Amino acid sequence: MKKILFAAAVMALFTVNANAQFGFGAPQQQSGEPKAPELEYVVRLNVTLGQAFTVGDTGKGTRTVIPITGGTFEGPDIKGEVLPGGADYQMQCDGRTEIEAIYCIRTDDGVSIHVRNCGIIKMGGQGGMYFRCAPKFEAPKDSKYSWMNECLFLCQPGFGAGGGITLDVWKVK
């Protein structure tokens, strides 16, 4: 019994310490209608793409690879270029496409940031389409962009000029 009480006390102390260390407050009781999270606009990426090629039916769906050949990006506090060499890896099955784009960007002040953007494309009725993604950014921890490592982002892709893609990215506040 003493071991159980000791373990409970240690867990309580750890929880209090973690809450203080990471800025978590006590869980708040939810009342009334749920409140949607706020979004803050971060950046628009204009990505140029190469010729897509199909790997074929893998048993999980049809794998297509679309090379990322470059591009630019700009937002209120960040701008630069999309580096060539990444790709958008797509898996299509039953009218639904899962995407995973992996590439790097370089800011105009010389900081390289890794991007991994996962999302879903689903064709709807009457020509509608659901196309949303959740990019993750990995910036150097000693850079002014390190805040990007600690945030959740959502993006709304669109088709750009010349067969490219445009990604508008928001931070979830």
Language-model segment annotations:
Residues 22-173:
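Beta-strand-enriched cores of mature, soluble protein domains
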